[in-house]
Amino acid sequence: MKTNKLVYGLFGLMALASCSDKMDYSETVVKDKDYVIQTFEKVGGFMTDIYNYADYDYGQNFGGGMLASATDESVYSVSGTSIETFYNGSWSPSNAQGSLWSNMYKGIKTCNVVLKDFQDLKFEDFELNADYQQQMYRYENYKWEARFWRAYFYFNLVRQYGGVPVIDPEMAAADVNNQPRKSSDEVFQYIFDECDAVKDSIIKDYSDLGSMALSTAEDGRANNLTVLALKARAALYWASPLFNPSGDKERYHKAALYTKELLDACEARGMKLAAKYADLWSTNNYKDADKKCEIIFGRRIYGTKISSTDPSDNVVESYNYPFGIDMAKASYSASGRNCPSQNLVDAYEMKDTGKGINEAGSGYDEQNPYAGRDPRFELTIAKNGDLWPTAANYKKAALQTYYGGVNAEPLVGATPTGYYLKKLLHGDIDLT
C-alpha cells in the first residue's frame, strides 16, 4: 500500500527552525491505517476502491480492440495494433498484454488489507449518531464483500494464467513474492470454498434492507447472487476442456448444480429476462427495475476520451460507429474498429424453428439471408442497407458495406467483413 507523506521545502524548514528550537506536530498519512479507521466514510471509501479493479472490455486495453477481435467473432479493421498479439504468435507470459495480472493482485492486496487491518472496529465516537446501526451493519458486511472480490480476482487470474500464487493476508511483505504457484485445481477449489463461506452471510438485497437501509441508493454492490454467479461461472470454466482434459463428468455435474443454485436464487428474488435486449446497455438502465431485471452484477462505464484531442466522451461509439459516416470529422469520430465476422453472423439461428441456418428444415433463405433470424441479430450487427446509427445526422443514407461502398474496403479502416457492430452502442449519439 503506497503511503502519501507530507513534504516540506528546505526553505520552509529553515524558517520554522528559526522561530523555535522544538516543534511538536504530527503528520497525517492519507492511507495510513490509523487515518482510515477514524470514520465509517473512510473505511467505506477504502472498501469501495476495490470495485475499481473490476475488469471490463470496451477496447480500452488494446487500442480500441475488444477481445472478440482476438477470436473468430470479430475482425479488427486496423492492422498493427496490440489486439493482434493474441493470434499472431507473439502472446506469451512475458508479453501478456493488458494489465490484468497487476490489477488483480492490486485488488487482492486491497482486499487483504481490509480483512487484516479493518476488522472489529466499533467507531465509538459515532455511537450517538442516528444512523450508527445502519453504518455498522454496512461495515460488518465489508469483510464478506472483500472475500467475494478476492475470489473474483483469483478467478480472473486462473482463467487466464492457470495456477497462480494465493496470497494470505497474514503473510509478511518479504514472503509475498516468493510464494509458489498453486495448481489450477487448487485455485478453483479456493474460489469455491470462499464463495461457500460468503454466500449466506453477505447482504442479500440492498433494495430490501428495511430499517438497515441508508438514505442513499446502493445499487451495484456485490450481494449473495453475485457470489453464487461467480461460483457457477468458475465451475463452468473448471469443467471445460481447458482445465478438464480428461472429461471428468463430476465436474460437469457440479457446474450444473451450482448453476441451478444460482437460477433458483434469482427466481426467488424475482429476476427475469429484460423485455428488450437493448435495455441491457441502455442509458441509465441501472435506475430502471424493468431494464436491469436480468443483470446480476455489472460495472457502470461512463464515457472516456480516447485522446486529448478527441472532443467526444463516447468512447465505444467513437471506436465502433461505421467508418465513413462522417468523413469530414477527425479520425477518431467513427472508426468502425470491431467488425462482426461472417462466423458470428452465421451463428444466429432462425427465429421460428430455432435451427441453425445449415440445418435441414431451418427455413433459411440464401436469397434473403438475414430474414427471420434470431431477433438479437438485428440489435447486434449493422449490415449493408441499414440506417445506422439512428441519430438524425447519420440517417441520410443507408450503409454501403459492399466492396467499393462508402463504408467499405478498399478504404483503409473500413470493415473487412461487410458488417459493423451495433451491440453496446447508443445509436442516437451524434459524434459531430
Where are these regions (language model features)?
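Bacterial Sec-dependent N-terminal signal peptides
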Residues: 1-28
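Membrane-proximal, proline-rich intrinsically disordered regions
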Residues: 19-67, 93-95, 348-371
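Conserved, well-structured interaction surfaces
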Residues: 41-48, 52-56, 79-162, 176-189, ...
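Short coil/turn linking the two alpha-helices of tandem helical-hairpin repeats
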Residues: 156-160, 165, 206, 237-246
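Amphipathic alpha-helical protein-interaction segments enriched in hydrophobic
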Residues: 219-230
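Polar, glycine-rich mid-to-C-terminal structural blocks
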Residues: 233, 237-240, 256, 260-366
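Flexible, polar/acidic helix-loop-strand segments at domain edges
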Residues: 353, 362-432
